[in-house]
């Protein structure tokens, strides 16, 4: 039986929450495999809005939901999110939610360092959410992170805190920021430990059992391919691998278990924060797209930058992310425009190129080459059948498929989960 990995194919905020919820109804297990509470999913179910950051979308439907070892976890943020979702009537128990015991923690000192660095960077800032994601991943690869399993051993916590503070307090001193008190940090961790540890488990074993019983697993990615620490617009990226190759590594299964890779992208392009954005619109059209699409970050509330669909970027995401098919979202936002534009290539130093360059200079200087497509006046909002789409909307979709070299498997026409057109069932592969 096929598994499915859902990943972003742009700069995040593509509408993964709705698609994951739509698929999770038919999945047996939902797994988060990377990122932290810097990314958010908004789910709308029966008129009720749920905003999730760390919790896998499956919890809302009572499905076994796993936070994998590739996720960095702020335990206080996680507990606050659990209580908020419980207050909406959702039952969250250790039978429903399991956290990888080898997942690394985000501590208050990580957010402290994150903000101190951004302030010191001035105009060269990356535009992080300031929630400590990057510093937590640094500690993971630096082999000094505190992991979920460490919460059960006070002696280990004391030793690891001492190691952490030798590193972090030196950095903080250099930035002119206040140092961290070890005793205070230990007290906070000992207080939160009994609230987190009941959810801790050997999740790779559970996933292996699921594999042998041929149950369906949905791997839920955060952010998007162009925020990948290797393949994105470095250094304006997140601190983890967001592409599907990390679904296995970040959850404890082999790469062959990932299955169908569904890339999510909007019918236009958005980005939050700093970094290059070749098709960004600074005119009334860009403003209109932002207003129609309600383009504000789920977690940060920051307005998103808006622009035309960039087929070069999405095609690159398809290639490096192993994307099998695309879920195209927010088509309805483009209703009423007389003409639309699709970026089909870039000009750089007088030459035409068909990829997004790796260098910062190249990324900043590429000029989009546009193809103009006729728009449509008929509303597509809430359409649930391909035959009810305007002919020009279908033409727009088909052109996108040609340019990105991947088929549209799913089309979303509103935030409501049922307002979708299934072209190809990812679980049927």
Swiss-Prot record:
The active site is at residues 13, 41. The keyword Phosphoprotein does not apply. GO terms for biological process: 'de novo' AMP biosynthetic process; IMP metabolic process. One of its GO terms (molecular function) is adenylosuccinate synthase activity. Substrate binds at residues 298-304. Plays an important role in the de novo pathway of purine nucleotide biosynthesis. Catalyzes the first committed step in the biosynthesis of AMP from IMP. Belongs to the adenylosuccinate synthetase family. This is Adenylosuccinate synthetase. The gene is purA.
